[in-house]
């Protein structure tokens, strides 16, 4: 197998997500010849030239926070050729509870050669696609158990409605916990705002992977003596930051750069304008929309 092809694809995915700064873990696999043969032999009539196997390459992205799923999905759909008709994106209903899927199918890059990793006898029924599943860290373990002990053993669960519902109920509990987690960090951010701990307020409000910058201390000290500006920072919408990051080249993410973005977008504070590097202003002007 040509592992370099797979690693290059994963690097492209990571660069796309890293540009947003969101917290995540990534897992991936390439179906082995044995696994591929097993899948085909299990139902020989299922796959043909009109219905091909689309998950030769499988990727899972487990996000720390549930509100980042749509943000990452949109970024990936901009980066790769998305195939909506083959993807599964569930909309939860109020009447029932069950796992919601966000299984996305994309075209493989033109540089990716299926023939290098698939035996000639199978190539006609392998699509030049990869499947990417978006999940949360809290739901990841549940999905693993579900896949190995329910999906792969469907016969063991036939007629066991009570047990199926109870198992789905575990997922519902995790889903509730995910929203509770978001609320907790909102409250943490507010507490630090009231205590004028600007750095902690930002870390808990943004929930992004931030790196230190030599301008951070200067910016934080400036904010501490400008209480009205602190209030504006606290009220600034996190989704707006993610939108700006997703429509521009990758930027080193630091507390100071995030504040500079807020300022050029909304505050137009003279003191912050004086501190803002020209490189960041050029970055701001490079929006793709």
Tell me the role of every PLM-derived stretch.
Residues 2-10, 66-69, 73:
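Generic alpha-helical secondary structure
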Residues 2-7, 16, 126-277, 281, ...:
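An acidic, glycine-/histidine-flanked metal-binding catalytic module
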Residues 4-43, 254, 271:
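Surface-exposed, low-hydrophobicity interaction/linker segments
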Residues 11-22, 56-63, 86-90:
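Short low-complexity stretches enriched in small and charged residues
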Residues 18-20, 53, 96, 124:
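A generic structural signal for short, solvent-exposed coil/turn residues
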Residues 25-69:
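Polyanion/phosphate-binding surface patch
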Residues 49, 120, 229-233:
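Short acidic, glycine/proline-enriched loop segments that cap or flank alpha-helices
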Residues 62-184:
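Long beta-strand-rich cores associated with HINT superfamily self-processing modules
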């Amino acid at each position: 197998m040509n592992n370099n092809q797979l690693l290059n694809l994963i690097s492209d995915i990571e660069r796309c997500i890293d540009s947003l700064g969101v917290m995540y873990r990534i897992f991936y696999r390439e179906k082995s010849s044995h696994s591929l043969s097993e899948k085909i032999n299990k139902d020989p009539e299922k796959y043909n030239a009109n219905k091909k196997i689309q998950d030769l390459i499988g990727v899972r992205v487990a996000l720390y926070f549930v509100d980042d799923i749509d943000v990452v999905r949109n970024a990936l759909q901009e980066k790769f050729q998305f195939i909506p008709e083959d993807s599964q994106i569930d909309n939860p209903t109020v009447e029932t509870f069950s796992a919601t899927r966000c299984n996305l199918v994309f075209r493989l890059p033109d540089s990716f050669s299926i023939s290098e990793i698939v035996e000639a006898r199978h190539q006609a029924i392998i699509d030049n696609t990869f499947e990417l599943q978006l999940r949360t860290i809290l739901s990841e373990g549940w999905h693993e158990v579900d896949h190995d002990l329910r999906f792969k053993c469907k016969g063991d669960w036939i007629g066991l409605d009570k047990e199926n519902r109870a198992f789905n109920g575990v997922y519902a509990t995790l889903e509730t916990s995910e929203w509770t987690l978001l609320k907790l960090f909102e409250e943490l951010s507010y507490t630090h705002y009231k205590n004028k701990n600007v750095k902690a307020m930002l870390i808990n409000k943004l929930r992004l992977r931030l790196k230190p910058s030599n301008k951070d201390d200067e910016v934080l000290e400036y904010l501490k003596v400008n209480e009205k500006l602190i209030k504006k920072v606290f009220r600034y919408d996190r989704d707006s930051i993610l939108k700006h990051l997703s429509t521009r080249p990758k930027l080193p993410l630091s507390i100071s750069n995030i504040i500079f973005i807020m300022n050029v977008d909304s505050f137009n504070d003279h003191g912050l304008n004086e501190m803002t590097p020209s490189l960041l202003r050029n970055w701001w002007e490079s929006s793709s929309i």
